Design a protein with these regions (language model features):
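Catalytic cysteine-centered active-site loop
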Residues: 40-92
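Structural motif
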Residues: 93-95, 115
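Intrinsically disordered, low-complexity
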Residues: 1-41, 147-161
Length: 161
């Protein structure tokens, strides 16, 4: 068999394996990175540590920096672009959504494990970790989603291309 062909096939195999990588494989890095932003102030429409974050801007920035994926900008668009999972299936790095403005998927955070999530909560507050079982969050829980690393998703664009 042609050695050049074998080399090309091996390159393709590695590229496919890289594409098949899941966010779960980078979950601890994602959570550790997100924890590095604890205390950053909330800013409506904010997308950076320098200016401050809103909830979806925080999630988007963490995924772009750590996983190399550019999620949609708003919480409801992020929910639509990700895979629905059962709350019992939550793993670190998954997204958790809440109805905080009398509409579904109006708030988003990153699940960190042990029933807790990290998020940019509201004006006057800072990025922090909270317990999902606290009555405020438990009553408003809207659903859990998992982010796939496939760059073929309609609303999911790979930032590392």
């Amino acid at each position: 068999m042609d050695k050049g062909l074998l080399t090309r096939l091996e390159d393709v195999r590695h590229k496919v394996a890289d594409k098949a990588h899941t966010v779960a494989g980078q979950a601890s890095e994602l959570v550790v990175n997100a924890m590095g932003f604890l205390g950053v102030p909330y800013k409506r429409g904010g997308t950076s540590a320098e200016s401050g974050f809103d909830c979806s801007g925080f999630v988007r920035a963490m995924y772009q920096q750590t996983v190399g994926l550019l999620l949609p900008r708003s919480a409801d668009q992020q929910a639509a672009a990700t895979q629905t999972i059962d709350k019992k299936e939550l793993q670190p790095g998954d997204l958790v959504f809440f109805n905080t403005m009398r509409r579904s998927f109006s708030h988003v955070g990153i699940y960190v494990g042990y029933g807790k999530f990290i998020h940019a909560p509201r004006s006057g507050a800072e990025v922090r970790v909270e317990d999902m079982s606290i009555s405020y969050w438990a009553r408003r829980f809207n659903g859990a989603r998992r982010v796939a690393t496939s760059s073929t998703g309609e609303n999911l664009v790979s930032a590392k291309q």
